[in-house]
Swiss-Prot record:
Cellular-component GO terms for this entry: plasma membrane
Subunit structure: The complex is composed of two ATP-binding proteins (PhnC), two transmembrane proteins (PhnE) and a solute-binding protein (PhnD).
Catalytic activity, EC: 7.3.2.2
Residues where ATP binds: G36, L37, S38, G39, A40, G41, K42, S43
Organism per entry: Treponema denticola (strain ATCC 35405 / DSM 14222 / CIP 103919 / JCM 8153 / KCTC 15104)
Subcellular location per the Swiss-Prot or TrEMBL entry: Cell inner membrane
Native organism taxonomy: Bacteria, Pseudomonadati, Spirochaetota, Spirochaetia, Spirochaetales
The protein, known as: Phosphonates import ATP-binding protein PhnC
């Protein structure tokens, strides 16, 4: 088991409970899709896992260790084992592709090396190899500001893999992409989950994508899990009755 959430709850200052007693596990190589409308709690849950938001109740257990109270070096070590893929890419637009990929190892190298761009030959070789893996080697020295959304997200995937993560957290990774680019990005994520045995937690609005690429789906409604099962068991009745009704939106629920 890579990750376990036990009774995670979070209440925002407005008084709305964004998460209510969330519990689940995810295994190595498993792709778990989190679905639900905006405000359902998807992004809050991902932020609690990465300690960008502190839950009010419950435990997050990663590789058998409770991470709720980790601080300083231990918290950085924990985060270095988790790759992040963002809806808005979170790239440095003025830098080229390989420089952005190299940023993926900043959490595991001395801060002075990162600040000065002092990467080892091994790190550089790994960055180029990852760009090749996602079909972006020919754009290695191109500024990211000149690339398409799909190309930027592929660089985002390579950057996340730079730290050799045990877990990928993907916050709406295809929300800004066209259908073809979306399929390309999800194919790469699935490929790495299978070939590198990386657990992947992906929040999605696109139901068909969740059914096609996920091994398992969890649906949230108003901060509660209303479905947890395999894609084939998620029928229209469950969708309309349990998932896409009575969702309240709160300013606390944001993308990562």
């Amino acid at each position: 088991m890579i990750l376990e959430l036990k009774n995670i709850s979070k209440t925002y200052p407005s008084g709305r409970r964004a998460l209510q007693s969330i519990s689940f596990k995810i295994e190595e190589g498993e792709i778990l899709a989190i679905i639900g409308l905006s405000g359902a709690g998807k992004s809050t849950m991902l932020r609690c896992i990465n300690r960008l938001v502190e839950p009010d109740e419950g435990e997050v257990i990663f590789l058998g260790e409770k991470i709720n109270k980790l601080k300083g070096k231990k918290l950085r070590q924990y985060r270095s084992k988790i790759g992040m893929i963002f809806q808005n890419y979170n790239l440095v637009e003025r830098l080229n592709a390989v420089e952005n990929v190299l940023h993926g190892c900043l959490g595991s190298i001395p801060s002075y090396r990162g600040a000065l761009g002092l990467y080892t030959e091994e790190e550089k070789e790994k960055a180029f190899a990852l760009l090749q893996t996602v079909g972006m080697e020919e754009f290695a020295f191109q500024r990211c500001s000149e690339l398409s959304g799909g190309q930027k997200q592929r660089i985002g995937i390579a950057r996340a893999l730079m730290q050799s993560p045990k877990l990928l957290l993907c916050d709406e990774p295809i929300a800004s992409l066209d259908p073809q680019s979306s399929e390309t990005v999800l194919n790469y994520i699935k490929e790495f989950a299978v070939n590198k045995n990386i657990a992947c937690l992906i929040s999605l609005h696109q139901m068909e994508a969740a059914k096609k690429y996920a091994d398992r789906i969890i649906a949230l409604n108003n901060g509660k899990i209303v479905f947890d099962g395999i894609p084939d068991s998620l029928n229209d009745e469950v969708l309309h009755k349990e998932i896409f009704t009575n969702v309240s939106i709160d300013s606390g629920e944001k993308s990562l």
